[in-house]
């Protein structure tokens, strides 16, 4: 077989082996095979290879195993080109060598080479076996996997456990649940690997119930299957389930969690603001054999930032060895969401100046958010324009979202509107919602109504747009307009996303909704709410009832505001913690202007620092003021 130009490399030649073998007495072939397997370096393999070539043993029909052993040895020492060059220099390679070469190409990302080798195998009139297909499937996309699946069936290997597992994995990675399920259901024996691949498939599609059912039915579970299930919960909006499963893993004692487990659990903590649980995981990592590598450190930075403890995030960041771009991005985003815009921009510049790392599209999202939160219009526009001009990064919808938010919050509504119209891509509902929110903030109800009614005409299903339009109508007392929007939502089956606020007390996350009376301490919570209401009124509080969407009497509007979810969470925090201790509240939606005013007053009259994370950013309330400067 001719040598491939792509794989040309410096393998030993006969004429070069004299020196290498002058003091090397050749052992018998069986011993050579053992020596190849035990080789500690590529130099040892090259020396043995040279000796074998000198004695022409590679061509000996009794010793084909030497070729295979050399191929695998080069691959195991990272000399992939040596390994594949050896294959291409072999005359009439057999099935075992073809399979070894396909496997080497596949596991090293040389997908095209793997398929070329498979075609050569078929051209040599050699029938592939189960190991050939298992190796080749590692290089398959869903599309090519379907083609290879037909070959698998042609050669009668459809129910082989190794091949079936490979097929399930290919379909799972491509999100083809139906095909994966068909192969999985036909397997006479389901392996740990195939079951884990199927769980991955369910989890990727957000079907965590099916994933958990299969997970629970497994007789044996390794750490990979645990990780897939925990991460599946965390990535699809079930953070509490993720943490409960993590605790179950620890309680069972085996298998031991690894770095991937910890990162998934930290992600779950980030979503619900479970700071104490996140801190416990940090301590657990330090006391276990889990390495505090850059991935775990980045997970900790993200968790501490999103759970309201920026100081601890900074400490972890400073102690992180060999920071990669993901770690820098996490810290920049942390500064941005807490309103420390100048620190975010400083880090953006330090990252490039000190480390030489180039920013990615994710870096620019955090940096532009920092500009938006601080109203740094000129700086934000300069950074946005530099993406393409200096770094060759094409702006995505998220970057336009930051720019539109920046312009809108600064009151440049027409400019924000023009930016959306001039984009080279279709605007999504998040982008339009940003402009609508800015219209409400700056009182431009004409433009707001125009945009909202245009979007409703496009039949956009985002409930936030309808709610913003309702807010615009309510702000000017147009309750007929509010009722019209509400009826329209009913007709289209659009349900308003409920506001949910959480607070963590003694490692337990407590959840509240507006008007919630299901908490065990509900009586004490409402008593505290009444006390708060009396005290803030004595400090000049006047309810902003324009934020109430219902056409109610003024007293009823005030009562409606008093039981918003964030106020219930704050009240529970006040009765459950020591006087003067800080409170951390997490809300899934933007905090309304009235609750923002009330929280400032509560921080003043109680002498407490209150940290609140809403959909947009963090608010640090201290002594009657907020870190956002009432700009959010």
Swiss-Prot record:
Keyword field: Chloroplast, Metal-binding, mRNA processing, Plastid, Repeat, RNA-binding, Transit peptide, Zinc
Residue ranges of the region described as Type E motif: 431-506
One Pfam family named in its UniProt record: DYW_deaminase
MF-aspect GO terms: RNA binding; zinc ion binding
GO CC, one annotated term: chloroplast
A GO BP annotation: mRNA processing
Record flagged with keyword Cell cycle: no
Compartments in which it is found: Plastid, Chloroplast
Matching InterPro entries: DYW_dom, E_motif, Pentatricopeptide_rpt, PPR_At4g14850-like_plant, TPR-like_helical_dom_sf
Transit peptide: first to last position: 1-19
Region (Required for function in RNA editing): 497-512
PPR repeats mapped onto the chain: 94-128, 129-159, 160-194, 196-221, 222-256, 258-292, 293-323, 324-354, 360-395, 396-426
UniProt cofactor(s): Zn(2+)
Cofactor binding summary note: Binds 2 zinc ions per subunit.
Region of interest called Type E(+) motif, as start-end residue ranges on this chain: 507-537
Positions of region (Type DYW motif): 538-632
Protein task: Plays a major role in single RNA editing events in chloroplasts. Acts as a site-recognition transacting factor involved in the edition of the site 5 of ndhB1 and ndhB2 (ndhB1-5 and ndhB2-5 sites corresponding to cytidine-830), which are plastid-encoded subunits of the NADH-plastoquinone oxidoreductase. May provide the catalytic activity for editing site conversion.
Family in the record: Belongs to the PPR family. PCMP-H subfamily.
Protein name: Pentatricopeptide repeat-containing protein ELI1, chloroplastic
Native organism: Arabidopsis thaliana
Gene name of the encoded protein: ELI1
């Amino acid at each position: 077989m001719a040598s491939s130009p792509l794989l040309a490399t410096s393998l030993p030649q006969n004429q070069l082996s004299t020196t290498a073998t002058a003091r090397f007495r050749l052992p018998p072939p069986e011993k050579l095979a053992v020596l190849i397997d035990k080789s500690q370096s590529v130099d040892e393999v090259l020396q043995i290879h040279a000796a074998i070539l000198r004695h022409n043993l590679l061509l000996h029909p009794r010793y084909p195993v030497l070729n295979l052993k050399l191929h695998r040895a080069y691959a195991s020492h990272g000399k992939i080109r040596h390994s594949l060059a050896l294959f291409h220099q072999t005359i009439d390679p057999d099935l075992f060598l073809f399979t070894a070469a396909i496997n080497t190409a596949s596991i090293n990302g040389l997908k095209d080479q793997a398929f070329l080798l498979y075609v050569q195998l078929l051209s040599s009139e050699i029938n592939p076996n189960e190991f050939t297909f298992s190796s080749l499937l590692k290089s398959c996309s869903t599309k090519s996997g379907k083609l290879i699946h037909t070959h698998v069936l042609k050669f009668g290997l459809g129910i082989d456990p190794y091949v079936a597992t490979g097929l399930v994995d290919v379909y799972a990675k491509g999100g083809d649940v139906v095909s994966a399920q068909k192969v999985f259901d036909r397997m006479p024996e389901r392996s740990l690997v195939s079951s884990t691949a199927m769980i991955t498939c369910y989890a990727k599609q957000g079907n965590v119930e099916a994933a958990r059912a299969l997970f629970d039915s497994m007789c044996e579970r390794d750490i990979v299957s645990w990780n897939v299930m925990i991460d599946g919960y965390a990535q699809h909006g079930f953070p509490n389930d993720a943490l409960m499963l993590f605790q179950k893993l620890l309680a069972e004692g085996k298998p031991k969690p690894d770095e991937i487990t910890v990162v998934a659990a930290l992600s779950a903590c980030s979503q619900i603001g479970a700071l104490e649980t996140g801190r416990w995981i940090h301590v657990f990592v330090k006391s276990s054999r889990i390495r505090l590598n850059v991935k775990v450190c980045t997970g900790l930075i993200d968790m501490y930032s999103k759970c309201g403890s920026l100081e601890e995030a900074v400490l972890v960041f400073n102690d992180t060895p060999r920071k990669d771009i993901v770690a820098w991005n996490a810290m920049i985003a942390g500064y941005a969401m807490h309103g420390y815009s100048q620190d975010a921009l400083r880090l953006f510049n330090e990252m490039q100046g000190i480390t030489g790392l180039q920013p990615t599209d994710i870096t620019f999202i955090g940096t532009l958010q920092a500009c938006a939160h601080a109203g740094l219009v000129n700086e934000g526009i300069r950074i946005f324009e530099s993406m393409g001009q200096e770094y060759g990064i094409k702006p995505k919808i998220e970057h336009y979202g930051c720019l539109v938010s920046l312009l809108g919050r600064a009151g440049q509504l027409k400019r924000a509107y023009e930016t959306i119209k001039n984009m080279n891509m279709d605007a999504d509902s998040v982008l339009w919602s940003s402009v609508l929110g800015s219209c409400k903030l700056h009182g431009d109800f004409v433009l707001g109504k125009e945009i909202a009614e245009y979007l409703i005409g496009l039949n956009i299903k985002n409930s936030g747009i309808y709610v913003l339009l309702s807010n615009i109508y309510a702000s000017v007392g147009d309750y007929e307009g509010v009722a019209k929007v509400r009826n329209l939502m009913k007709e289209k089956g659009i349900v308003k996303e409920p506001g949910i606020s959480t607070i963590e007390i003694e490692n337990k996350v407590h959840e509240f909704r507006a008007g919630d009376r299901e908490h065990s301490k509900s009586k004490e919570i409402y008593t505290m709410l009444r006390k708060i209401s009396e005290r803030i009124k004595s400090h000049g509080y006047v309810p902003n009832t324009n934020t109430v969407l219902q056409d109610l009497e003024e007293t009823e509007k005030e009562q409606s505001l008093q039981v918003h979810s964030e106020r219930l969470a704050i009240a529970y925090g006040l009765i459950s913690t020591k006087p003067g201790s800080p409170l951390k509240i997490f809300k899934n939606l933007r905090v309304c202007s009235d609750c923002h005013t009330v929280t400032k007053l509560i921080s003043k009259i109680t002498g407490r620092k209150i940290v609140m994370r809403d959909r947009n950013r963090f608010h640090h309330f201290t002594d009657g003021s907020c870190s956002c400067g009432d700009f959010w």
